[in-house]
Each structure stands twice: as structure tokens, then as C-alpha cells.
Amino acid sequence: CRALLDAIEDGNRADGINIIALFDHEEIGSNSKQGAASIMLHDMLRRILRNMDLSENEIDESIYDAMLLSVDVAHALHPNKKEKMDITNKPVMGKGFCIKQACSQSYATDAQAIAILCQLCDEKGIPYQRFVNRSDSRGGSTLGSIAGTLLPVKTVDIGIPILAMHSA
């Protein structure tokens, strides 16, 4: 959270709105008034834009032009479970964050958002990796795909690769 706040404080934007959205109840489905499946983020964004004296059409255009960076963790290549990974996308720890994708849309990552993020990382020399769920495995999901059902914005799910994500 500190890094997110520092980024907004240190950001040098002449226009636009930066929002950090932290949701509750992620591990139990996000179906609460303060979870990612609520209309809270959508309504809050519309209220902010309405208070900027934008028309409804301008509000819609602003939302469609927005981008959501959904930040979580990612499964790193586990030395004891190599068969669980897609053979062409094996993220490892310490080599940059992962851009996460799944054909099931359990990650909300879309092509336009990937292009924007990859270009930015390439320009700034920020290392990144790709993680694609195997198509024969359900895999996880993120708040990006949940929030995206109510907020139609360009989205990319990213995460820092770790081992043993759900072990105690």
C-alpha cells in the first residue's frame, strides 16, 4: 500500500485521476458492499466525474478511456510442480512482475492494456514476465475480472511471482 500511495504523491500528472481501490472479502468471493463485485468503484468514479461538470457522454468516454491495473501475486515456477505451468510461460522469482492472462478470462487482462503496459515498461527498463494459465487447468482469478464486470475499462492483471501462494 505504501508504494501505491508514494506513486500517487510523487506522480507528475497534468490531467487525469489516479485512484487506489482496496477491496474487502477477496478470499470469500468479493460479494459484499465493499467487495470488488459491488458497484462501489463504478459509482465513486461516476460521482467524481460528475462533480467535474462532465456530461453523461463525457463521463462514459472517460470511463472507456480509463485503465485498471489489478495488482496481486502470481504463481512462480515451482521446482516440484513444473508440469502445472504452461511450457512457454514459466515466471520465476526475481525476474520482474508477471502480466497474467487466462483464456477463461479469470484474469481480466486485455490486449490493449498489455500493449500500453509493455510499452511503458520497455521505455523505463522495467523487467516483466508473462504468465498464461494452462487451458486445461482452471487456475486462479483476481479482483480485476470481478471489478471489470461493472467497470468497462482497459485492464491488466499483474503479480509478483511467489511460491506456495495458498499454503499455510
Where are these regions (language model features)?
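Conserved alpha/beta core surface patches that mediate binding of polyanionic ligands
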Residues: C1, D6, L69, D136-G144
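Short glycine-aspartate micro-motif
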Residues: I20, L68-S70, T155-D157
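Generic secondary-structure signature for well-ordered alpha-helical cores
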Residues: L5-N12, R46, R50-L54, C118-P127, ...
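A glycine- and small/hydrophobic-rich beta-loop-beta segment
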Residues: K33-G96, K100
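Active-site-adjacent substrate-binding region
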Residues: A74-S167
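Beta-rich nucleic-acid/ligand-interaction surfaces
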Residues: F23-Q34, S135-G144
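Flexible, glycine/charged-enriched surface loops at secondary-structure junctions
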Residues: G11-I20, D53-D65, C121-S135
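Alpha-helical metal-binding/catalytic segments enriched in His/Glu/Asp
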Residues: C1-G29
